[in-house]
From Swiss-Prot:
Location in or out of the cell: Endomembrane system; Cytoplasm, Cytoskeleton
Domain called DOCKER: residue spans: 1210-1621
Domain C2 DOCK-type: 423-607
Chain residue ranges for the region called Disordered: 1652-1703
Stated name of the protein: Dedicator of cytokinesis protein 2
Phosphoserine PTM sites in chain numbering: 588, 593, 1683, 1704, 1729, 1782
PROSITE patterns from the UniProt entry: C2_DOCK, DOCKER, SH3
Upper taxonomic lineage: Eukaryota, Metazoa, Chordata, Craniata, Vertebrata
Sites of N6-acetyllysine modification: 304, 738
Family named by the database record: Belongs to the DOCK family.
Boundaries of every SH3 domain copy: 8-69
Pfam family name, one: DOCK-C2
Length: 1828
């Protein structure tokens, strides 16, 4: 086989197919997995997954698509970088990261967000393909990058991922190459942009945010329109005039774009097909802010007058007739709100004119208002909004805007008029006319013919342009409206003529009637004319707006003679009335006269950079023509409209500087020119004209040429400054200071031009003048006059703006010195805010970038900063703080960009002067302060720029050691606070990591100082070291460094860029600890928690380095005290909080054990103690990890189990506070599940820690949530009330009564609160009534086995008994159980599995129903207890359970299966009784017994007898019960046709053969016979009841059953003897209700005791019993009150036919319970006592009860069973003990008249006892004997 070889180029690839590895060495791949390839061999690669480097293996080459990479080597480590463009890589990484979140959103059912992320991912995938294609034009690529980065940033924000900071080109900023301040500002900017983007997304107003943001930020815009097609049935040629239209103002706002369309449906010029492109330019922000903008198209037909005329030859052709309009609202496209894509086609519907005389303009308004149907006719266009003017868009969009693209300019100037943009366009709009028909019978069809004529009447060729894209023409023919007296054309054309011709030209308008027939039309001549000159006599142009012209009539030939009409008036006189007279006009010359009937109006708009409409401005521009008016014109300039001035900015400035240059020898006009210049500069500073800054800049650099102007400008400026300094009035000085920047620009440019012209001549003189000028400024700053305050503020604001220019012609160092003096001459506390703002501008200038300048300026700046920052922080100084931090930011930013060699001293200056000041500002500033993040960034930047030598130098600047300690303490506290409460938003990952890197270095540097200065015993500073350790641990445990919690992409990003900083600081902590020496003991146990927190970080190397510190701590304490209890206590306390908080794992537990045990090798004396400690901690960790593992689990059962495990641990280790904490957690879990009984038992454990005393509670035994102090009695009483409420909800009234009695004793005997006692006794009575009247369902019990290694340790291979909820079936329980473990497999057998299943890796669950086993106790033995009471104990307070299954053995008799039916019975013993603090407990013992067929028969017979007896009792108690169940039961036993009863037992067991083969079963056979014999009296009693209740129609059935019974009775009594029950006659009379008894007087226990042999006495006195004695089920309480010693009547209870349940009641030692005078345990003993009592003590403080407590820890707390005290049935000998035990159950008053009958009943029970078999017989309790 060929050897594996290292790959060279094949380094990086992506899986394009799924690869499922079949061998161990194969690497399984999924589509999209990125792999790093290391080696290759044939068709195989070897490598690993990028996202999981531990997943290594081989995989086929054919499954991998290779990617180009570049390999970078850093410190012998190869860094492989994909060769794709960075943005494509970023998209790939983003898609990976979003992909996993996208799946999580699906699982979490967050549909809306899921679909949103999916849509964004699809967008990114598509854009990534476009990026990788490499085919996009430059402008589209740029736009796509913006879209991609915007989408990524937005997606990251809504998915709560880290913010990505970028440069201006969208590339991710590298923190290593970016200063801290730049990084901070980049984060701020990115956050702002994303916040704005989210606002836009939420408002849904701005879907294309990228376009919107660019459009809104640019001053000039253009709209690109591409006409794709025009669909319209015309039949003649047409002209399409497209323009932009403002519907509110009803004005066209752009030039027309003219498309000439042919009659055959194509452009007139076929080469224009697919090339009809236009750009509407010069659109400004004002246009974007219009309410609405429409794209309109006016269609003019060229042809016949009437399109319907058939005879085309006779018709006049070439007429321009209205045809229709097309309109589209493009407001959203213009504003960037709607999609703007050059590929998307828009349809603009066409609307024709409804009549021949409809005006197009009017139709436009109707269409906009109505939006009628177009019938499918219209324009198809594509549009795109472009940013920039025509020059810019030609560069940025060359594929759209080329030489063939038509440019349609705006009607009017753009918002910025650039120099060189020479324009002389005059727009003429034909508005309307009113023409009289005179001699014609109908109104005229008027056509206007416009031309541009010279003063001699000649037509100027090509002077008129109808629309952009069309050739210029000599004359323009208007649209003809048919027979309209007042036509409204509203047609706009452009007149473009050379400027030099403007003075001699005029516009001439001819009016002609056009006839429909060609023959008539030829004879038509011009019937009138108008004219207008474009220039006025004063040299200004025609003013913009409306003009009503004179209409001249006369000879048509004379109309073409300029000399004939130019002498006539052009405008109608304002007062001239159109309808005055029809008489001949007084104005007539040479055959032409003014018509008084006809009217014609136009409007004009002049867009000229050379022609002005202002006389004053014109006078200045042409000052040479009238020099005598120069002073006047200069003064008038200030009142000229600003718009007019800026329009002619270049010409105006040229004029001003020409005046200055031509009067260089005189200063006559210097101040006037200077003031005029200041006025112009002031105009441009105005917000309205701020865009003209670029124009002024361009003028200064390209057009300005006054070489001597600097001298005059400096002279005037100095004069103004000096005048103001003296406090004298100088009106222009404030405007001058505001214009200082441009004044200096002119000065510097002028000096530069002079220097170039004369090769540096007069440089010394210039510098001296400049110096004196600055000295004048400084003098102004020193001035104390009130009038100068405002000037000083202005100087501070505007002086920095001149530096950029001044330093080009002036020595920088000298300039810095002048600036130094400028700031120092201002009094210290004066204008501080303005000084700082001014300094900030200085710092941002080029001057500050020079080292020698910084040397001069930095000290004055730091001094000012220090003074301001150290002022008291209140609202007044808030603004100063803001400016201070901005200034400091600027300084640090400048220094970060310089070479370190040139900034060393400057960093040192800032460090010494400002570091501590900034630190203290951060410390005192609130964390919610708006500026806190800015100051922290500043502080971080200072530390970042400090070198090692800076640190050393700074430490030495402290004069005393206490001052140094204070500084270090301040710094440590500040660092810790900033780490704990990050001042940056959570998604500022890069900023946080840079801060951490800087802090880490600073901490280590300061640690070196501590080692050097504060380690020795005499100089040891405990608090300083303590602060250091706490800071270091806070640093290492901060969330932003826990790499394991991050996504794979983020993990790699941080690791590659910053490394794992936790290791570095962790190793430092270790080293610092070991350097402490004898001082270590000071930090025990204080540092145990922090060190524990550090060791729990899941980084193996860090753990190995830091866990030994624990051993060192133990050793240190051990050597001092002989033990390490403090350490141990602290570890246990802190471990709980840490693990619950998510820290710690199995690996930690193992590592802790192995490392600590290794450490003991060298210290054998402590080895055993350490071993015990490790065992303890390991046990706690296991339980805590189990608990944490199920905290988020849906299964509350598992959480409860783990909580109980922790309860036991804390109880065993005497941790009261933690014990109580988990008690309440368990209580809350139970309440969530409505397990009220279990919640009550849980809370009861807390009460056992409390005494009935007025002692104040210690904090550790306080109830969770109780903050105010309480006494033991108050807390215990409160808890009892809560517990009683829980027991009531859980229907555990027996337990509730027990607690009520204990409370009653306190109320009666201790606090004597009879009111509370009354309420308590009422409550008890209610509970007793509930026991007797309310049905309580018996819960089922289920055995559950968890087998297999897949289960957690607290379940693995264990069996539990679960107590089911009310009416919960096994199937439901099992389904719910399996839902908690979806991967578990259900076992179908009930036998215990083998080791193969137990050791299997999976999960196997076994679940089956078990029967509770009732424990016998003397309390109920041989006593007449009602079913309501005894049934409760059958399924409560049980600890033993069994499960039975039949098995066949021996020979099977098909006729009698009982003979061979054995029972295999599995018995379970739980750790504690149920119910308890859990609904389940672990099985601690299992045993299996086999029950013979004879024993099974005995059990079966016992069950049947019990069932008969129970049913008799029910029917005695409730006469309303239906008779059917009793009928079926009795008939099934007595009828031979049905009966299979004991006959099958006789056949199987009562044979000589059986007796011979089983001599050991004689007693059992006797027992069975005895049970058969006892069945007869029970059946007899049942039949007697049946006889009384049977209906007539069932009487034959009863008779038959009675006959069968007689036969059966005869047979049984003959063979097994006679048994008779006492007869209950006449017992109702005079008996209290509570003493009434039915046949059910013999409980299950007493029945089980009747295992007598045949020698049982056969007769008892008949008068002892009365079958009629049972009372009704629910008699009214008011009628028969309950006596204290009585029981309540029984309720109707149905018995399950499927199973027999036994009950059990366990008692405390009765004799011990009487010892009421014994002392209570101490608090500590009480807590140490076992919470897992096997018996429940109602008064836990008594020694008699406590003596039964097990002090050895068990695995789970027990559920205390009912004690004698709880039941309230003490023996008669207890009557004189505590009041709580003073009441007896069967106490009868001496006056009872029926005492004799009671004795007879007891005599019957005594007889029953005597009949027991010898092995079952037990000693009769004393109290029973006494009673008898």
């Amino acid at each position: 086989m060929a050897p594996w070889r290292k790959t060279d180029k094949e380094r990086h690839g992506v899986a394009i197919y799924n690869f499922q590895g079949s061998e161990a060495q194969h690497l399984t791949l999924q589509i999209g997995d990125v792999v790093r390839i290391q080696e290759t061999c044939g068709d195989w690669y070897r490598g690993y997954l990028i996202k999981h480097k531990l997943s290594q293996g081989i995989f086929p080459t054919s499954f991998i698509h290779l990617k180009e990479v570049t390999v970078e080597k850093r410190r012998n480590i190869e860094n492989i970088i994909p060769a794709e463009i960075p943005l494509a890589q970023e998209v790939t990484t983003t898609l990976w990261e979003w992909g996993s979140i996208w799946k999580q959103l699906y699982v979490a059912s967050k549909k809306e967000r899921f679909l949103q992320v999916q849509s964004m991912m699809y967008d990114l995938m598509e854009w990534r393909s476009q990026l990788l294609s490499g085919t996009l034009p430059k402008d589209e690529l740029k736009e796509l990058k913006q879209k991609v980065t915007s989408k990524i940033d937005y997606g990251n924000k809504i998915l709560e991922l880290d913010l990505i900071v970028r440069d201006e080109d969208g590339n991710i900023l590298d923190p290593d190459k970016t200063s801290v301040i730049s990084l901070f500002h980049a984060h701020e900017e990115a956050t702002y942009k994303i916040t704005e983007r989210i606002k836009e997304e939420m408002s849904k107003d701005q879907p294309d945010y990228g376009v919107y943001s660019r459009i809104s930020s640019s001053p000039t815009h253009s709209l690109y329109v591409f006409v794709r097609n025009f669909v319209c049935r015309i039949g003649e040629d047409a002209e399409l005039f497209m323009s932009l239209y403002d519907p509110h103002k009803q004005t066209v706002i752009s030039e027309n774009y003219l498309v000439r369309w042919g009659s055959k449906g194509f452009p007139k010029e076929i080469e224009m097909l697919n090339n009809l492109k236009v750009v509407f330019t010069d659109l400004g922000n004002k246009d974007l802010n219009r309410d609405k903008i429409f794209l309109i198209c006016q269609i003019v037909r060229i042809g016949k007058m009437d399109l319907k005329d058939i005879n085309a030859k006779k018709c006049t052709q070439g007429l321009r007739r209205p045809f229709g309009v097309a309109v589209m609202d493009i407001t959203d496209i213009i504003k960037g709100k709607a999609e703007s894509d050059e590929e998307k086609q828009h349809f603009i519907p066409f609307h024709p004119v409804s009549a021949e005389n409809d005006f197009l303009h009017s139709l436009l308004g109707k269409v906009i208002a109505s939006k009628g149907d177009s019938g499918g006719q219209g324009l198809w266009v594509t549009m795109k909004m472009l940013v920039g003017d025509i020059i810019q868009i030609r560069k940025d969009y060359p594929h759209l805007v080329d030489r063939t693209t038509v440019v349609a300019r705006k009607l009017g100037f753009p918002e910025i008029i650039m120099p060189g943009d020479v324009r002389n366009d005059i727009y003429i709009t034909l508005l309307q006319g009113d023409f009289d028909k005179y001699t014609k019978t109908t109104q005229r069809n008027v056509e206007v013919i416009m031309c541009v004529c010279t003063e001699d009447g000649k037509v100027l060729p090509n002077a008129i342009c109808v629309g952009a894209g069309d050739k210029a023409m000599n004359e323009y023919h208007s649209v003809v409206y048919y027979q309209v007296k007042q036509p409204r054309w509203m047609e706009t054309v452009k007149v473009a003529v050379p400027i030099e011709d403007m003075q001699r030209i005029h516009l001439r308008f001819m009016f002609r009637h056009r006839s429909s027939l060609e023959s008539k039309d030829k004879g038509e001549k011009n019937f009138a004319m108008s004219y207008v000159k474009l220039m006025k006599e004063d040299g200004t142009t025609l003013h913009d707006g409306y003009h009503e012209l004179v209409v001249l009539k006369g000879d048509s030939k004379k109309m073409e003679d300029a000399s004939a009409y130019l002498t006539l008036p052009s405008y109608r006189h304002p007062v001239e009335n159109k309808g005055a007279t029809l008489s001949r006009s007084s104005s007539s010359v040479g055959g032409l006269s003014v018509s008084s009937r006809d009217v014609f109006s136009i409007s004009t708009l002049v867009c000229s950079t050379k022609l002005t409409q202002n006389v004053g401005l014109l006078g200045l521009l042409k000052w040479r023509m009238k020099p005598q008016l120069l002073q006047e014109n200069l003064e008038k300039l200030k009142i000229v409209d600003g718009e007019e001035v800026v329009k002619f900015l270049q010409d105006t400035l040229d004029a001003l500087f020409n005046i200055m240059m031509e009067h260089s020898q005189s200063n006559e006009y210097d101040i006037l020119v200077f003031d005029a210049l200041i006025y112009i500069i002031g105009l441009i500073a105005d917000r309205k004209f701020q865009h003209f800054n670029t124009v002024l800049e361009a003028y200064i650099q390209q057009h300005f040429s006054a070489t001597l102007a600097y001298k005059k400008l400096m002279t005037v400026l100095k004069t103004y400054l000096d005048t103001s300094s003296r406090g004298e009035q100088c009106e222009p000085i404030l405007r001058t200071l505001k214009a200082l920047e441009y004044v200096f620009k002119f000065i510097v440019r002028s000096r530069t031009l002079f220097s170039q012209l004369y090769e540096g001549k007069e440089q010394m003189e210039f510098e001296e003048s400049m110096r004196r000028l600055f000295e004048s400024i400084n003098n102004l700053m020193k001035s104390q006059y009130k009038t100068t305050i405002l000037l000083q503020v202005a100087a501070l604001k505007y002086i920095p703006s001149v530096l950029h220019d001044v330093e080009t012609v002036f020595d920088a160092k000298l300039l810095s010195q002048l600036l130094y003096e400028f700031y120092t001459c201002i009094p210290p506390v004066k204008l501080q805010k303005q000084k700082v703002q001014s300094m900030n501008e200085i710092v941002q200038s080029n001057l500050f970038k020079k080292q020698e300048c910084r040397d001069i300026l930095l000290p004055v700046i730091t001094k000012e900063l220090k003074e301001l920052l150290e002022q008291r922080d209140d609202g007044q100084h808030q603004a100063e703080k803001k400016h201070c931090v901005e200034l400091l930011n600027s300084i640090l930013e400048v220094l970060s960009c310089q070479d370190a060699a040139f900034t060393y001293d400057h960093i040192q200056e800032i460090m010494v002067q400002l570091l501590r000041t900034v630190n203290r500002t951060v410390i005192t500033m609130g964390r919610d302060h708006a500026l806190i993040s800015h100051f922290v960034a500043c502080m971080t930047a200072i530390l970042d720029q400090m070198g090692d030598q800076h640190y050393s130098f700074y430490i030495e600047t402290f004069q005393t050691s206490s001052d140094l300690v204070d500084f270090l303490m301040e710094t440590f506290i500040m660092f810790k606070d900033l780490i704990g409460k990050n001042v940056y938003p959570g998604d500022w990952m890069a900023m946080s990591m840079v801060q951490n890197r800087v802090f880490l270095r600073a901490i280590n540097k300061f640690a070196e100082t501590m080692n050097q200065k504060f380690l020795e015993h005499t100089s040891f500073e405990f608090q300083l070291w303590n602060n250091y350790f706490h800071l270091a641990v806070a640093f290492i445990t901060q969330d932003s460094l826990q790499l394991e919690q991050f996504t794979h992409a983020k993990y790699n990003k941080i690791l590659n860029k910053y490394g794992d900083m936790r290791r570095l600081i962790g190793f430092s902590i270790r080293d610092m600890w070991y350097k402490l020496g004898q001082n270590k003991i000071c930090f025990i146990p204080g540092m145990v928690g922090p060190i524990l927190e550090m060791t729990l970080i899941p980084e193996a190397e860090l753990r190995k380095a830091t866990i030994p510190i624990f051993f060192d701590m133990m050793l240190c304490e051990y050597q001092r005290t002989g033990a390490f209890k403090k350490f141990e206590n602290e570890i246990i306390l802190k471990l709980d909080h840490e693990v619950e908080g998510g820290r710690g794992d199995e690996q930690y537990m193992q590592l802790l054990e192995s490392i600590l045990m290794e450490c003991t090798a060298e210290h054998p004396t402590i080895a055993k103690s350490v071993e015990n400690f490790v065992s303890l901690v390991k046990g706690l960790l296991e339980k805590l990890l189990d608990y944490r593992g199920v905290m988020t689990d849906e299964s509350k059962d598992n959480r409860m189990s783990c909580t109980v495990n922790l309860l036991n641990f804390y109880k065993d280790n005497n941790r009261e506070e933690m014990y109580i904490r988990y008690l309440y957690k368990l209580r809350d879990l139970h309440l969530d599940c409505e397990n009220y009984t279990e919640a009550a038992y849980t809370l009861l454990l807390h009460t056992w820690l409390l005494k009935w005393s007025d002692e104040q509670c210690a904090s550790q035994v306080m109830q969770t949530g109780q903050q105010h102090p309480q006494t033991h009695r108050q807390l215990k009483e409160t808890l009892y009330e809560t517990i009683i409420g829980y027991f009531d909800k859980g229907k555990m009234w027996e337990e509730a009564i027990s607690l009520c009695k204990e409370l009653a004793e306190q109320y009666e005997m201790e606090i004597f609160d009879y009111e509370l006692l009354s309420q308590n006794l009422t409550q008890q009575a209610k509970f007793y009534e509930n026991i007797m009247k309310i049905l309580r369902t018996k819960p089922d019990y289920f055995a559950v086995g968890y087998y297999g290694q897949g289960f957690p340790s607290f379940l693995r291979n264990k069996v539990f008994i679960y107590r089911g909820k009310e009416y919960e079936r096994r199937e439901d329980f099992q389904m719910q159980l399996l839902s908690q473990f979806p991967n578990a497999e259900k076992m179908n057998t009930t036998s215990a599995p083998g080791d193969d299943v137990r050791n299997a890796p999976g999960q196997y669950i076994q679940c089956f129903t078990v029967q509770p086993v009732l424990d016998e106790h003397p309390r109920f033995k041989n006593k007449p207890v009602p079913d309501q009471i005894i049934n409760f104990y059958k399924s409560n307070y049980v600890q033993k359970f069994h499960y039975s299954r039949p098995v066949r053995r021996g020979k099977v008799d098909p006729e009698n299966e009982f003979a061979s039916m054995w029972i295999e019975r599995t018995s379970f013993l739980t750790a504690y009784k149920l119910p308890g603090i859990l609904r389940w407990f672990e099985v601690v013992h299992m045993s299996q017994t086999t029950i013979s067929p004879l024993e099974n028969a005995i059990e079966t017979m016992s069950t049947v007898n019990e069932k008969i007896l129970m049913m008799i009792n029910q029917y005695q108690s409730d006469e309303s019960l239906p008779i059917n169940p009793l009928s079926m039961l009795l008939n099934g036993i007595v009828d031979p046709a049905v009966m299979g009863g004991f006959a099958k037992y006789e056949k199987a067991f009562f044979t000589e053969e059986y007796s011979r083969e089983h001599p050991e079963d004689q007693d059992k056979l006797s027992h069975l016979k005895d049970l058969i014999a006892w069945q007869i009296p029970f059946l007899g009693a049942g039949i007697k009841i049946h006889e009384k209740r049977v209906s007539d129609n069932l009487r034959p059935f009863h008779d038959r059953m009675e006959e069968c019974f007689k036969n059966l009775k005869m047979k049984v009594e003959k063979e097994y003897g006679v048994r008779e029950m006492p007869d209950f006659e006449d017992r109702r009379v005079g008996r209290p209700r509570s003493m009434l008894r039915s046949y059910r007087q013999m409980s299950v226990i007493s029945l089980a005791s009747m295992h007598s042999d045949c020698s049982t006495p056969s007769k008892v006195p008949a008068e002892s019993f009365d079958l009629e004695s049972a009372p009704p089920k629910t008699p009214k309480v008011e009628e028969e009150p309950i006596s204290p010693g009585s029981t309540l009547p029984e309720v109707k209870l149905r018995r399950s036919k499927k199973r027999t349940k036994r009950s059990s009641v366990v008692f405390a030692d009765e004799k011990a319970a009487t010892e009421s005078d014994l002392k209570r345990l101490s608090r500590k003993q009480e807590f140490m006592s076992d919470t897992n009592l096997s018996e429940h003590a109602a008064i836990p403080a008594r020694v008699s009860i406590l003596s039964q407590m097990s002090f050895a820890s068990q695995s789970m707390p027990t559920i205390p069973a009912l004690t004698l005290s709880v039941a309230g049935v003490p023996g008669l000998d207890e009557a004189n003990t505590s009041p709580r035990l003073s009441q007896t159950f069967f106490q009868v008053s001496d006056g009872d008249k029926k005492t004799l009958k009671k004795k007879k009943v007891n005599q019957f029970f005594k007889t029953m006892l005597a009949s027991k078999s010898s092995e079952e017989s037990k000693q009769i309790p004393d109290f029973l004997s006494t009673n008898m």
